[in-house]
Amino acid sequence: MVAAECMTKIEFSKVAPCVGARVSGIVIEQAYDADLAQRLQTALAEYGVLFFEFGRTVTEEEQRQFGSFFGEVEPVYGFSTGKNSGGLIDARVQSLKEYRTSIWHSDGTPFEHPPHGALLAAVEPPELGGGTMFASMAAAYDALSPHYQRLLDGLEVLHTTFRTPFVKQKSEFVHPAVIRDPITGRKLLFVNATYSERFVGLEDRENDSLMHFICEHINQPEFHCTMNWKVGSMVVWHNRVVQHRAVDSFIGERKLRRVTILGDKPVA
């Protein structure tokens, strides 16, 4: 398929009221095209997560090449979260609960430059369950009262890997509690239950109360959408616009392959 044909046919359809879009009219073999890349990047910023169904398992090289539409990518790695350790692609990951992937999070927030996003493709999808959920941080911020918005606009948050033992590289970094997407201009909550340790400058009781409130606020279903994995499924998500979590109840194996899109420093 040539780029011009793809540009005329590509369509985005919402999968939930405030987050996620299903993309049609594009093939995984699509050659890189700057105009198409810009359109996909804009859609990713707008919807937070893009769902693709290619009808067959995406290869490592195809996934990596497709990632170049969204930015510079890291090497491919895979993981499995099933009951049979012999089926692991990457033995570092054995349990969703142990590795906290079933808790809402944005990747890499304890580092100065968290990933911009990621592509996740089904290698061996579960027979039932085991989806990946996404939550819009733009919608979560917009739903707060003006009072809470003003409070959070002026706060910073310490993010740490020290309470997540599966992360080998230990790091802490302070980011704004609210950041802004440069494409849409929307404000985004940048606080998550996995890595956010505390609000800088608050007393312990103040911090605990506010952190609990924000994490419960993010957990409201009206901010969410879910990818239910099947053969040929792939998602691309924006690591600032959405948080994600794995559903830790499923039947069968759950093997996925991931490509990470490199990012810069989040700014308010």
Tell me the role of every PLM-derived stretch:
Residues 2-234, 239-268:
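Non-heme Fe(II) oxygenase catalytic core, chiefly the N-lobe of the double-stranded beta-helix
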